[in-house]
Amino acid sequence: MIPSFGIGRQAPQDRVDEWIAAVAPGRSFVDIGGIGEQSGNERCSWAQRCGAVNVAMADILPLNDDLWEYFLGTMRARGVTNIDVRPGVDVDDPGLATKLGRFDIVQATGLLYHLPNPVHSLLNLRRVVGEYLITNTVVIPDLVENAEGRIAFPAASALFLPALRGRERAVLRRHYLDRFSVDLDFHAPMGDGAMMPYVIKGEPSPWPYWWFFTKSAFERALEMLEMRVLDRYTWQDHAHFVFLRRN
């Protein structure tokens, strides 16, 4: 059966797929971080179907991780071949450009809110972008109101989740549980003993949620890349996607 979503799909599943289809023919392509969540958001197979060449999947995880095994196994099962594999790629690595090289199209979504220094991460990503960058982050609404209370976020806001406590935490936890079945007590833990702690062996972890931005604050950060915004879209006032081109 031909899947309508995920690896091997034959039609665009969202706006990001449409962006890729518009520029993929004859261009190199890398998807950074696309093996997560059962590879449901991977873009390699779609980019290849749309005519991209030198297509690669990169991720911070080592090749022996279960997520790589699932990704590669599903690729084989669905007849997708000739995808280059780049394990152990950290977007915060000062040597990223040397390790990964440059691709015409860089797709890096689902990453920035997991990183402790997202502006640094964006600037580092720019070093591997030949022409186009597709990225996103989780955004906070201007106003959140529910049974736990009410919080307004000024346009320039960036929310540091390790510091989230008290009423603000209660309001936002209820918001994300009700709308997306996401529990901030798991993804943005408060104390010791968490399954995804913020610091592991003295180093920041890339697994919990670190930062949420307002849409305007995120786009202001993107301006630092000195790239031109071609298009944008927001999914359910929650995930903000931006399609950029180098000047």
Regions found by a protein language model. Name each.
Residues 26-38:
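Conserved class I S-adenosyl-L-methionine
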Residues 116-246:
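S-adenosyl-L-methionine-dependent methyltransferase catalytic module, highlighting the catalytic core
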